[in-house]
């Protein structure tokens, strides 16, 4: 059994109503529920955080190492293109992660084509709407199956 952390970056709390032609009509709660179901079916623990504040995401990443989180799925949203601090937090804790995006960032504005995370991620999933999260979670399962986490004993 592993522990997976899903981090949702800025403005993702508006899913379902914000630019639905780009991001779809599913809410963040809908996505989280699907992911929780998938994790429970596999016997894994799943934690979530959505924040519009960079420091909250960074603090949660730091806490993840202390808590023994085995894998992170992160949609850094707009921080993808701006946050060296968030990148440094992920690199600093050494927890493997997948970068995830609802839209295909490469088919959008040029400023969205650069990511501060993709070169240190296990992989990147983008362009499949809410299914991007499910695909990223499946990638986490596959990674964890190949790299079995050590069991914690209380």
Swiss-Prot record:
Molecular function terms from GO: 3-dehydroquinate dehydratase activity
Keywords: Amino-acid biosynthesis, Aromatic amino acid biosynthesis, Lyase
EC top class named in words: lyase
Marked site: Transition state stabilizer: 18
The keyword Membrane is annotated on this UniProt entry: no
SUPFAM superfamilies cross-referenced by the UniProt entry: Type II 3-dehydroquinate dehydratase
Pathway connected to this protein: Metabolic intermediate biosynthesis; chorismate biosynthesis; chorismate from D-erythrose 4-phosphate and phosphoenolpyruvate: step 3/7
Gene Ontology terms describing biological process: amino acid biosynthetic process; aromatic amino acid family biosynthetic process; chorismate biosynthetic process; quinate catabolic process
Active-site residues annotated for this sequence: 23 (proton acceptor), 101 (proton donor)
Pfam families: DHquinase_II
Chain positions recorded as substrate binding sites: 75, 81, 88, 102-103, 112
EC number of this enzyme: 4.2.1.10
Catalytic reaction equation(s): 3-dehydroquinate = 3-dehydroshikimate + H2O
HAMAP family linked to this entry: AroQ
Sequence similarity: Belongs to the type-II 3-dehydroquinase family.
Function summary: Catalyzes a trans-dehydration via an enolate intermediate.
Subunit structure: Homododecamer.
Protein name, per record: 3-dehydroquinate dehydratase
Annotated organism of origin: Teredinibacter turnerae (strain ATCC 39867 / T7901)
């Amino acid at each position: 059994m592993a522990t997976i952390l899903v981090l949702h970056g800025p403005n993702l709390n508006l899913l379902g109503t914000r630019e639905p032609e780009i991001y779809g009509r599913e809410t963040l709660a809908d996505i989280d529920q699907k992911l929780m179901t998938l994790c429970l079916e596999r016997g894994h623990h799943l934690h979530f955080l959505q924040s519009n504040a960079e420091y909250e995401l960074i603090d949660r990443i730091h806490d993840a190492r202390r808590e023994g989180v085995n894998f992170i799925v992160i949609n850094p949203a707009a921080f993808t293109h701006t946050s060296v601090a968030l990148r440094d937090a992920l690199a600093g804790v050494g927890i493997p992660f997948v970068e995830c995006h609802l839209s295909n960032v490469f088919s959008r504005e040029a400023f969205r084509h650069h990511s501060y995370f993709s070169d240190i991620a296990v992989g990147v999933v983008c362009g499949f709407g809410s299914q991007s999260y499910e695909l990223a979670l499946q990638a986490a399962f596959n990674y964890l199956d190949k790299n079995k986490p050590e069991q914690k004993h209380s």
